[in-house]
């Protein structure tokens, strides 16, 4: 099912745009910005320059986006960027701000991909860019999906395989959530549909997403319906296992007790779903996130597995984000000290304003 009105890539680097595989190669879909200032060679991790260029070329970007078929019928915008680089981290907040100003009432969600551990330890600019990107997007986006690259790394795998695997694992949980409310085939319409309205009412502030699955046993067509109590128990345990996996594989480590809103979607063959299973999943999520307003839905599909997608939003505190801000404040203080402006130790709340906003 095609749930996307259009997919576009924006960059200041010609080489990065040329390396894409699935986005159309024309200039309306691969959008080069800042060519006169960078000669198509990127901004060299200087996120302030990325923000300036995005502000200058924002009309070019939006004009290209508007060419998408069905643009005005879309429910929301979804912007993705790496937090550690220059173009993405600098421009995502700028573009989010302009989209919200032009298309009032249409939510804009940002996906911010956090750097690998080795990037944080070897490149000083990484921490600074990440902190400014997180602060800027949080101030303007309706919700910010946090993706921690380090959670998905396989240490002994080749770099290209690692990146492809990470991209796939990041994207997979979104698919069923986006499809469930757009389904037109009545065979695949759930008894409790999770549609765009449910998603919009759930997403706000810091947000994480995860997916889990459990393989179903193959049954012969002439075996008839399941009647044994052990089979019923097995169905429930598979669904619970899939939810446990989804929560353990959330895109960022969080404390579910700090979550204000959440949703879960059960995707499986219609005959494998029941109200008992949905209730059990809801009870499990409620136990983990007692303070959350929970929404749920089911999505019947022809498949040999049970999939559960979990989204947790309105997260009160994320330790890793706080760490980025703390390190960035220390870095800014050191930079000022080197310029002869002095160094003074202050609380995080008092120093937070020193992190620039790239809008």
Model regions and ranges:
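Tubulin/FtsZ superfamily GTPase core signature
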Residues: 1-359
């Amino acid at each position: 099912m095609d749930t996307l009105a259009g997919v576009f890539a924006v960059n200041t680097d010609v080489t990065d745009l040329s390396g894409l595989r699935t986005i159309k190669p024309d200039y309306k879909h691969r959008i080069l910005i800042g060519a006169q200032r960078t000669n198509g060679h990127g901004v060299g991790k200087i996120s302030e320059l990325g923000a300036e260029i995005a502000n200058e070329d924002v009309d070019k970007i939006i004009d290209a986006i508007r060419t998408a078929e069905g643009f005005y019928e879309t429910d929301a915008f979804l912007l993705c960027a790496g937090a550690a680089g220059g173009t993405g981290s600098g421009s995502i907040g700028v573009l989010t701000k302009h989209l919200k100003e032009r298309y009032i009432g249409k939510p804009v969600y940002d996906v911010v991909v956090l750097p690998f551990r080795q990037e944080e330890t070897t490149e000083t600019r990484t921490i600074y860019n990440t902190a400014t990107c997180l602060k800027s997007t949080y101030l303007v986006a309706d919700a910010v999906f946090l993706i921690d690259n380090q959670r998905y790394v396989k240490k002994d795998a080749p770099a290209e395989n690692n990146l492809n695997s990470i991209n796939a694992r990041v994207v997979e949980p979104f698919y069923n959530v986006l499809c469930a409310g757009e389904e037109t085939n009545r065979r695949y319409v759930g008894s409790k549909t999770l549609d765009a309205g449910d998603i919009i009412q759930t997403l706000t502030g810091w947000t994480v997403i995860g997916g889990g699955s459990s393989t179903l046993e193959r049954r012969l067509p002439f075996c008839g319906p399941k009647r044994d109590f052990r089979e019923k128990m097995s169905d429930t345990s598979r669904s619970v296992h899939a939810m446990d996996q989804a929560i353990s594989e959330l895109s960022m480590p969080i404390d579910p007790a700090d979550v204000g809103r959440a949703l879960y979607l059960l995707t499986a063959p219609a005959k494998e779903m029941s109200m008992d299973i949905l209730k059990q999943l809801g009870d499990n999520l409620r136990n983990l996130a007692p303070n959350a307003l929970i929404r749920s839905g089911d999505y019947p599909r022809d498949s040999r597995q049970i999939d559960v997608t979990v989204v947790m939003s309105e997260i009160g505190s994320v330790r890793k984000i706080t760490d980025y801000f703390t390190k960035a404040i220390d870095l800014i203080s050191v930079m000022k000290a080197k310029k002869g402006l002095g160094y003074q130790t202050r609380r995080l709340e008092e120093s937070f304003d020193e992190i620039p906003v790239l809008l």
